[in-house]
Design a protein with these regions (language model features):
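Short amphipathic alpha-helical coiled-coil/interface segments
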Residues: 2-9, 201, 221-229
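A common structural junction motif
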Residues: 87-95, 202-213
Length: 281
């Protein structure tokens, strides 16, 4: 495994999106593992990995009382239990499974600005930190993100992309267990500066905070969200993934299945209040 990991790490060092992503997380989470370490680790980590530490890590965490087997499909539950027992029944629980006491991030009082150098065309990324994926705030964030950008008729679509004010612009939410993130990204046209693109993106945030958008946009995006969820639920893979996400994020399954009902009741005033609370400069 060591050689592929080193190759992947070396490749990541030349990929601007990866470097930007890691810089964003390091800026938003200076005290949390989301920002203090990366999935691949450092070059120093990969030079001389400890096999003993790897084995101990597996022994500690890869245990039945820290694992979920998520299934969806047309199967006989009785036969499936036998199959699961056959392949996973040998695993022993860790009765001393550690509890992760991770540092809580303090509120950011000023923008954190980082410049990344690389071979790709220049672009700008803006990011805001939110509560984790199991929170009610993340439910609202998903709708807010759709109002801003949905590749058709969001604020960014209508006011930036369709008017060709920048080469491209978009936003999307990033869901994680302890925190979530809203990312906005834009690419400048020839002769346009990154600060100008930043201004365009922030202008759409200001419109959201001021309530300068049609209330029908909220209703339409909620309906689109419903449609997307219905289409996902037609696939066994998507249904099983919902179980996985709920397990990883530590959410109550009852909250998961009623999330759409709550999201459907969101009002424009609630969206505006949410934007003013979290989407500041």
């Amino acid at each position: 495994l060591r050689v592929p990991e080193i190759v992947e790490k070396n490749m990541s060092l030349t990929r601007d999106p990866r470097k930007v992503y890691e810089a964003v997380l390091a800026s938003l989470f200076p005290h949390h593992p989301y920002g203090t370490q990366t999935v691949l680790g450092t070059q120093e980590d990969l030079k001389n990995p400890s096999i003993t530490n790897i084995k101990n890590y597996k022994k500690t965490w890869y245990v039945p009382n820290n694992i979920a087997i998520c299934l969806s499909g047309d199967f006989d539950p009785g036969k499936m239990i036998v199959t699961i027992d056959k392949y996973f029944g040998h695993m022993k629980p860790n009765m001393n499974l550690p509890k992760l006491n991770l540092a809580k991030e303090e509120a950011l009082t000023a923008p954190v600005v980082k410049e990344i150098l690389g071979p790709d065309a220049e672009n700008i990324t803006l990011a805001w930190r939110f509560p984790g994926a199991a929170s009610k705030e993340y439910e609202t964030l998903q709708i807010v993100s759709q109002i801003l950008y949905n590749d058709k008729a969001g604020l960014i679509d209508l006011n930036i992309n369709q008017q060709q004010k920048a080469l491209s612009a978009y936003c999307y939410p990033l869901d994680m267990a302890d925190y979530s993130v809203l990312l906005m990204q834009g690419r400048p046209k020839q002769g346009q500066t990154l600060d100008e693109v930043k201004g365009l993106l922030l202008e759409e945030i200001k419109k959201l905070r001021a309530g300068d958008f049609d209330e029908k946009m909220l209703e339409a995006n909620i309906n689109n969200f419903k449609l997307g969820l219905m289409q996902q639920l037609e696939k066994n893979e998507s249904r099983a993934q919902m179980f996985v996400n709920s397990f990883i994020n530590g959410s109550n399954w009852a909250d998961e299945v009623t999330a759409l009902e709550r999201m459907s009741k969101l009002t424009k005033s609630e969206i505006v209040a949410f934007a003013n609370k979290y989407l500041n400069e």
